[in-house]
Amino acid sequence: MPTVSMRDMLQAGVHFGHQTRYWNPKMGQYIFGARNKIHIINLEHTVPAFNDALAVIKQMASQKKKVLFVGTKRAAQKTVKEQAERAGMPYVSNRWLGGMLTNYKTIRGSIRSYRDLETQSQDGTFEKLTKKEALMRTRTMDKLELSIGGIKDMGGLPDAMFVIDVEHERIAIQEANKLGIPVIGVVDTNSDPAGVDYVIPGNDDAIRAIKLYVTAMADACLEGAREGSPAAAADEFVEVESEEKVANNG
């Protein structure tokens, strides 16, 4: 089971919150104190909260459920895209389009258009078009790639959503709440934890901290997927069978 230690978190700067004047009183229970007018997050809360969230994600992945990774702020974009792709999970790393979940039917239409253009670009259709028409279609495809490329294989609504910076992704969280999709979120000292089912109190700005969260989540997805695979189930069956033989022979 992938877990993250307090030492890992300290090295990544997870404990550094925002300036004290920007704090949200709802995060008071997670604050250890202040240093140089910066709130310090109590990692005694963060470590178990994060490891509990990893266990939930691992369990979901073992049941072939989809976890949507969301991080559209500049510091998170690259890591969210890379790690979600590594884990084989959907992601939104550029911009959250209003209605991405609550108006999924329309989004599905855009995904179909994107897939069609992708096919055309690969099967030689673009080469038969005028330069201008081919350029226009390429531009449309690139735009769609940016906005929905990460969810093209989601195949329906996700089973959970993992969010970096809940304040920045408030619309995404509201949509998930409306649909009863559980939200796991990294919540800094300036943010409102409302609407987040699994609160991970921590720094949501430092690239090292973001890498730590997102990489561990991707690892949990991969480990869960391995355990839920037919090969893993077969290994388990063989083990049980051999135990039964020993018992019968004894």
From Swiss-Prot:
UniProt keyword annotations, A-Z: Ribonucleoprotein, Ribosomal protein
Gene3D superfamilies the record matches: Glucose-6-phosphate isomerase like protein, domain 1, Helix hairpin bin
Gene Ontology terms: cellular component: cytosolic small ribosomal subunit
Record's signal peptide: none
Superkingdom of the organism of origin: Bacteria
Pfam families (alphabetical): Ribosomal_S2
SUPFAM superfamilies: Ribosomal protein S2
Sample GO molecular function, one term: structural constituent of ribosome
Family according to the record: Belongs to the universal ribosomal protein uS2 family.
HAMAP family according to UniProt: Ribosomal_uS2_B (MF_00291_B)
PANTHER family assigned: 30S RIBOSOMAL PROTEIN S2 PROKARYOTIC AND ORGANELLAR, SMALL RIBOSOMAL SUBUNIT PROTEIN US2M
Record NCBIfam families: rpsB_bact
Protein name, as recorded: Small ribosomal subunit protein uS2
Encoding gene (name): rpsB
